[in-house]
């Protein structure tokens, strides 16, 4: 990535012209009879015409007589400008200088420069063209450079210069900068002439994201869009045709690509063609182009996406929750539709595999929750759009960092935190000495824990929530289960409800008060046909007193079976009355209407927690005094009018009596 400052250390045998190169670069002229070593020179960004220059570049001259000082400077360097000038100094490149760098444990790019090449302009990266600033390179078969390049992977580029004739001095300096701003080593293995695996992986991902219609080709329009995104400018038709022709010619002339298509007429560039094109850029010294593509997709020098992009800082209080914003939902809808190639309304396994090729794979959280069976699937087991959005809503609620990470991998181009909505902190109120949660009006995702004795019907409840048929087969829950779905309340408002069952981990979960407080509503379920079932809930509530801080809904499951008297010191209706709660809802997986009533009830309670908070005395109903006061005002007005009428009438009568006959 672009650095604010680059430190270039110039080293080599005495007399090879290190100081002359620096002086020529700075003064733009050859200066003879310089001192043994120049002081460090700071070169600002505007010195170079290159758009990739850092804010400052420091050039450090060295002298061999001060070995300790030389080694200190090398350890502080970003890049090494290694200079030789004749056969003897060339021999010491491999025998002395490269060995010294390795003994110091340096892992820095080395730009090898043959100075005093006063007879011509030559510049080599292996035996291939490496166009530098101004694209001045020529193809060079150089018996000096090639052995060094093959023997030492640290040597990134070789160039012939002349300080006396001012030849390639600026280019050599530019190559030193480019070795840091646009390093070749992460992209290309010069020894085997191939792109490195991480580069291939990154470029394949970029191809998939740029292939908007998912037809496995980059069309002219898609290439133009990629060009605009990466470089901020459009691509000329002639440039595009030149790329196409290059790929076609390469397919015809190179046996390596005989069995694969690089470009198909009227369709576009294939994935292999895209990789080959970037390989050619690396071979020809134009890897700035590849880096321009990579960095527009947020890749760092290590070919990983920056953590600052994957995990943006989001300010969240302890009692806030995180949900998807409308922008996040819109993006995920677009992703679903783009990868649903057969337009059947569901993502099958192959479509999901293609979708997640752009990412590190299926999110760990999804694997742990048995995706896709933790949400809505169609009759063929393919996740639907409803299930897709529900699962992402759950993921964001539980671990929003997974959501931002995968949104970036899937091609979300804006700041990932714009895809999130942070709810207001949960507020508490107090009534008669009991704290309870205030009503919620800015949330759409709620978390419900289902607690109850094994074999009470909790798993069947989760399956019914996802619209699946009831199964008579009992399978004990060992690991936690989770289900998420959307539901619509009166008024057309849509919410997402997460149901969690903990199985054998239930005691450990309930011991963890912080984990318990993440819940919005408790669903306490028992088997109404099992006389031993309800006592489990009584013991649970009495043992874990902190559960009473949460709103509760008691549920009598298997209501289609014969109801049994519970073998407990308190019956369900009496126990709920003691807690000042409503009597248990009678639910059966065989009665769809009762299930819908339960899920709506759970969501309503999450929105209005006070209604179902244990031991919370209902707020006194205040009589509506409006009618009373209206009646009082009317009566007062009538009384006033009557008084005025009586007074006026009496005055009239008196005046009549006083009139003489």
From Swiss-Prot:
<feature type="binding site">
    <location>
        <position position="351"/>
    </location>
    <ligand>
        <name>Ca(2+) 2</name>
    </ligand>
</feature>
<feature type="domain" description="Miro 2">
    <location>
        <begin position="443"/>
        <end position="608"/>
    </location>
</feature>
<dbReference type="GO" id="GO:1990456">
    <property type="term" value="P:mitochondrion-endoplasmic reticulum membrane tethering"/>
</dbReference>
<dbReference type="Pfam" id="PF00071">
    <property type="entry name" value="Ras"/>
</dbReference>
<dbReference type="InterPro" id="IPR021181">
    <property type="entry name" value="Miro"/>
</dbReference>
<dbReference type="GO" id="GO:0000001">
    <property type="term" value="P:mitochondrion inheritance"/>
</dbReference>
<dbReference type="GO" id="GO:0010821">
    <property type="term" value="P:regulation of mitochondrion organization"/>
</dbReference>
<keyword id="KW-0812">Transmembrane</keyword>
<dbReference type="InterPro" id="IPR013567">
    <property type="entry name" value="EF_hand_assoc_2"/>
</dbReference>
<keyword id="KW-0496">Mitochondrion</keyword>
<feature type="topological domain" description="Cytoplasmic">
    <location>
        <begin position="1"/>
        <end position="626"/>
    </location>
</feature>
<feature type="binding site">
    <location>
        <position position="344"/>
    </location>
    <ligand>
        <name>Ca(2+) 2</name>
    </ligand>
</feature>
<dbReference type="InterPro" id="IPR013566">
    <property type="entry name" value="EF_hand_assoc_1"/>
</dbReference>
<keyword id="KW-0342">GTP-binding</keyword>
<feature type="binding site">
    <location>
        <begin position="557"/>
        <end position="560"/>
    </location>
    <ligand>
        <name>GTP 2</name>
    </ligand>
</feature>
<keyword id="KW-0677">Repeat</keyword>
<keyword id="KW-1133">Transmembrane helix</keyword>
<feature type="binding site">
    <location>
        <begin position="488"/>
        <end position="492"/>
    </location>
    <ligand>
        <name>GTP 2</name>
    </ligand>
</feature>
<feature type="domain" description="EF-hand 1">
    <location>
        <begin position="198"/>
        <end position="233"/>
    </location>
</feature>
<keyword id="KW-0547">Nucleotide-binding</keyword>
<protein>
    <recommendedName>
        <fullName>Mitochondrial Rho GTPase 1</fullName>
        <ecNumber>3.6.5.-</ecNumber>
    </recommendedName>
</protein>
<feature type="binding site">
    <location>
        <position position="340"/>
    </location>
    <ligand>
        <name>Ca(2+) 2</name>
    </ligand>
</feature>
<feature type="domain" description="EF-hand 2">
    <location>
        <begin position="327"/>
        <end position="362"/>
    </location>
</feature>
<keyword id="KW-0378">Hydrolase</keyword>
<feature type="transmembrane region" description="Helical; Anchor for type IV membrane protein">
    <location>
        <begin position="627"/>
        <end position="647"/>
    </location>
</feature>
<feature type="binding site">
    <location>
        <begin position="452"/>
        <end position="459"/>
    </location>
    <ligand>
        <name>GTP 2</name>
    </ligand>
</feature>
<dbReference type="GO" id="GO:0032865">
    <property type="term" value="C:ERMES complex"/>
</dbReference>
<feature type="binding site">
    <location>
        <position position="211"/>
    </location>
    <ligand>
        <name>Ca(2+) 1</name>
    </ligand>
</feature>
<keyword id="KW-0479">Metal-binding</keyword>
<dbReference type="InterPro" id="IPR002048">
    <property type="entry name" value="EF_hand_dom"/>
</dbReference>
<feature type="binding site">
    <location>
        <position position="222"/>
    </location>
    <ligand>
        <name>Ca(2+) 1</name>
    </ligand>
</feature>
<feature type="binding site">
    <location>
        <begin position="12"/>
        <end position="19"/>
    </location>
    <ligand>
        <name>GTP 1</name>
    </ligand>
</feature>
<feature type="binding site">
    <location>
        <position position="213"/>
    </location>
    <ligand>
        <name>Ca(2+) 1</name>
    </ligand>
</feature>
<feature type="binding site">
    <location>
        <begin position="115"/>
        <end position="118"/>
    </location>
    <ligand>
        <name>GTP 1</name>
    </ligand>
</feature>
<feature type="binding site">
    <location>
        <begin position="61"/>
        <end position="63"/>
    </location>
    <ligand>
        <name>GTP 1</name>
    </ligand>
</feature>
<feature type="binding site">
    <location>
        <position position="342"/>
    </location>
    <ligand>
        <name>Ca(2+) 2</name>
    </ligand>
</feature>
<comment type="similarity">
    <text>Belongs to the mitochondrial Rho GTPase family.</text>
</comment>
<dbReference type="GO" id="GO:0055091">
    <property type="term" value="P:phospholipid homeostasis"/>
</dbReference>
<dbReference type="GO" id="GO:0005509">
    <property type="term" value="F:calcium ion binding"/>
</dbReference>
<dbReference type="InterPro" id="IPR001806">
    <property type="entry name" value="Small_GTPase"/>
</dbReference>
<dbReference type="GO" id="GO:0007005">
    <property type="term" value="P:mitochondrion organization"/>
</dbReference>
<comment type="function">
    <text>Mitochondrial GTPase involved in mitochondrial trafficking. Probably involved in control of anterograde transport of mitochondria and their subcellular distribution.</text>
</comment>
């Amino acid at each position: 990535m672009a650095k604010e400052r680059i430190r270039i250390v110039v080293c080599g045998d005495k007399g090879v012209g290190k100081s002359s190169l620096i002086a020529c670069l700075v003064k733009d002229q050859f200066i003879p009879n310089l001192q043994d070593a120049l002081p460090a020179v700071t070169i600002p960004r505007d010195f170079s015409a290159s758009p990739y220059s850092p804010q400052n570049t420091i050039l450090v001259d060295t002298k061999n007589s001060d070995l300790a000082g030389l080694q200190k400077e090398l350890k502080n360097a970003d890049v090494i400008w290694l200079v030789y000038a004749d056969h003897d100094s060339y021999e010491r490149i491999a025998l002395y200088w490269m060995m010294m760098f390795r003994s110091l444990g340096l892992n820095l790019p080395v730009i090898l420069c043959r100075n005093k090449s006063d007879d011509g302009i030559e510049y080599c990266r292996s035996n291939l063209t490496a166009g530098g600033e101004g694209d001045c390179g020529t193809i060079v078969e150089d018996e000096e450079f090639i052995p060094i390049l093959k023997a030492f992977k640290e040597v990134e580029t070789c160039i012939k210069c002349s300080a006396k004739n001012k030849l390639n001095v600026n280019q050599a300096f530019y190559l030193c900068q480019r070795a840091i701003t646009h390093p070749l080593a992460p992209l290309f293995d010069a020894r085997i002439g191939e792109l490195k695996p991480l580069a291939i992986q990154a470029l394949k991902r970029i191809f998939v994201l740029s292939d908007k219609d998912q037809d496995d080709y980059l069309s002219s329009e898609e290439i133009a869009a990629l060009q605009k995104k990466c470089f901020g400018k459009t691509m000329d038709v002639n440039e595009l045709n030149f790329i196409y022709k290059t790929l076609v010619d390469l397919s015809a002339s190179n046996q390596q690509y005989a069995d694969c298509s690089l470009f198909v007429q009227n369709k576009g560039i294939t994935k292999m063609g895209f990789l080959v094109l970037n390989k050619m850029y690396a071979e020809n010294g134009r890897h700035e182009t590849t880096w321009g593509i990579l960095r527009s997709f947020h890749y760092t020098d290590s070919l990983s996406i920056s953590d600052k992009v994957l995990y943006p800082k989001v300010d969240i209080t302890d009692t806030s929750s995180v949900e998807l914003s409308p922008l996040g939902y819109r993006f995920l809808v677009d992703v679903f539709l783009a990868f649903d190639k057969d337009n059947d309304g569901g993502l099958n396994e192959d479509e999901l595999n293609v979708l997640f090729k752009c990412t590190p794979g299926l999110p760990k959280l999804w694997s742990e929750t048995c995706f896709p069976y933790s949400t809505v699937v169609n009759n063929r087991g393919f996740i639907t759009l409803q299930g897709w959005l529900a699962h992402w809503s759950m993921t964001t609620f539980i671990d929003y960092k997974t959501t931002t990470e995968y949104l970036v991998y899937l091609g979300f181009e804006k700041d990932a935190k714009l895809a999130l909505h942070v709810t207001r902190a949960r507020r508490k109120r107090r009534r008669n000495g009991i704290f309870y949660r205030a009503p919620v009006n800015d949330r759409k995702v709620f978390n419900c824990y289902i607690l109850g004795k094994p074999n009470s019907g909790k798993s069947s409840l989760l399956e019914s929530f996802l619209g699946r048929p009831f199964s008579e087969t009992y399978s004990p829950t060992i690991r936690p289960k989770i289900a998420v779905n959307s539901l619509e309340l009166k008024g057309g408002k849509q919410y997402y409800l997460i149901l969690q069952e903990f199985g054998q981990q239930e005691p450990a979960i309930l011991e963890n008060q912080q984990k318990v407080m993440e819940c919005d509503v408790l669903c306490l379920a028992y088997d109404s046909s099992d006389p031993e079932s309800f006592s489990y809930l009584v013991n649970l509530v009495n043992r874990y007193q902190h559960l009473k801080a949460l709103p509760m809904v008691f549920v009598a499951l298997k209501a289609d079976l014969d109801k049994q008297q519970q073998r407990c010191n308190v019956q369900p209706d009496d126990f709920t009355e003691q807690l000042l709660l409503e009597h248990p809802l009678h639910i059966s997986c065989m009665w769809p209407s009762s299930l819908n009533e339960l899920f709506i009830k759970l969501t309503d309670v999450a929105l209005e927690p006070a209604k179902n908070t244990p031991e919370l005395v209902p707020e006194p109903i205040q009589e509506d005094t409006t009618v009373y006061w209206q009646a009082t005002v009317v009566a007062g007005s009538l009384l006033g009018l009557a008084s005025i009428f009586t007074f006026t009438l009496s005055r009239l009568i008196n005046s009549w009596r006083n009139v003489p006959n």
